[in-house]
Regions:
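Short, polar loop motifs at secondary-structure junctions
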Residues: 45, 164-165, 244-248
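Glycine-rich helix-loop-beta junction characteristic of Rossmann-like nucleotide cofactor-binding loops
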Residues: 29-35, 57, 187-188
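SAM cofactor-binding core of SAM-dependent methyltransferases
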Residues: 35-114, 158
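SAM-dependent nucleic-acid methyltransferase catalytic core
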Residues: 2-27, 81-196, 200-210, 225, ...
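Short active-site oxyanion
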Residues: 36-39, 61-63, 172-176, 230, ...
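Class I S-adenosyl-L-methionine
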Residues: 1-24, 34, 262-271, 276-282
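Short His-Asn-centered micro-motif
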Residues: 42-43, 67, 178-180, 197, ...
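Long, positively charged, glycine-interspersed low-complexity recognition regions
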Residues: 216-287
Length: 287
């Protein structure tokens, strides 16, 4: 049975996400243009910036496009948008059954041949359940696109947050949600649109890389391809902004654009003892 819940007047991500921007919004939002047409997030992840801009009324009367190559993430967005009540009911069942045995049983669904025959609501519930109960909130897959994150040690994980799901559903009602590569933004974006890229970061060290958000790698070659897309969007008059790691490789690549240093507290990390405040950069063109 679904509870009657008042939708929050503020909006926030319904999943935790590696590199999520909730703690950086106060530093990123002042770097955005005051005026823009449509809004694009081609690496949406948890969507923290989108939800904050929506909450502030800054996306009113604008067309919004959220992309991600991660098919399970995008399915979850679409289910939150279209079927929030069904999702809440399913998550309540997951919550009631939560245990170590249940976690690994649910995680193993993507090893089954009929995984994609499961309903969209079932798959979205699995995705959110694993996100809320796995080790450090990671989403990581192997080369076969199978989730391989162990269970976390949370005593009382918040598996089903009614209010967050309902408010997110409200925010997503008129949004275009697409399971496509970030490169597709070139087909949609036009002059004076705002494009915010939040890609898998270029690693600070050889051992610091974490790019397994999907079965697709995002390494040096892919960073250079992103740079070319960034330049092309700038040439057609888009407002383009990107978050990335504070590395010489990235700063040299974008040396002809404005680069701002910001500071992040990173709380999601596969090595909990390596958490802490680190510098990041925000790159933007000047339209």
């Amino acid at each position: 049975m679904t509870k009657t819940v008042e939708i929050k007047k503020t909006f926030q991500p319904f999943v935790k996400w590696v590199g999520g921007k909730r703690g950086l919004l106060s530093q990123i939002i002042p770097l955005l243009p005051e005026k823009f047409n449509n809004y694009f997030e081609p690496f949406v992840g948890g969507g923290a910036l989108f939800f904050e801009l929506y909450s502030k009324g800054l996306l009113k009367n604008k067309e919004v496009f959220l992309f991600d190559i991660n098919s399970e993430l995008i399915n979850a967005y679409n289910v939150v948008k279209k079927y929030p009540t069904k999702l809440i009911n399913e998550l309540e069942t997951f919550k009631q059954n939560h245990s170590k045995e249940f976690y690994y049983e649910i995680r193993a669904w993507d090893r089954e041949n009929d995984f994609l025959q499961r309903s969209d609501v079932q798959r979205a519930s699995r995705f959110i359940y694993l996100n809320k109960t796995c080790f450090n909130g990671l989403y990581r897959v192997n080369k076969n696109n199978q989730n391989n994150v162990p269970m976390g040690s949370y005593k009382n994980p918040n598996i089903c947050d009614y209010s967050v799901i309902l408010s997110a559903s409200q925010a997503l009602q008129n949004v275009n949600i697409l399971n496509v590569s970030y490169k597709e933004v070139l087909k949609y974006a036009s002059k004076d649109d705002l494009v915010y890229f939040d890609p898998p970061y270029f690693p600070l060290t050889q051992t610091a890389s974490f790019t397994s958000y999907s079965e697709f790698e995002f390494l040096e070659k892919e960073q250079i391809e992103l740079f070319e897309i960034f330049k092309n969007l700038s040439k057609i008059g888009c407002n383009v902004i990107q978050s990335n790691s504070d590395t010489e490789f990235i700063k040299d690549l974008y040396k002809d654009f404005e680069i701002k240093e910001i500071f992040a507290n990173r709380f999601i990390n596969s090595k909990s003892d390596s958490r802490g405040k680190i510098s990041e950069i925000v790159i933007r063109n000047q339209i």
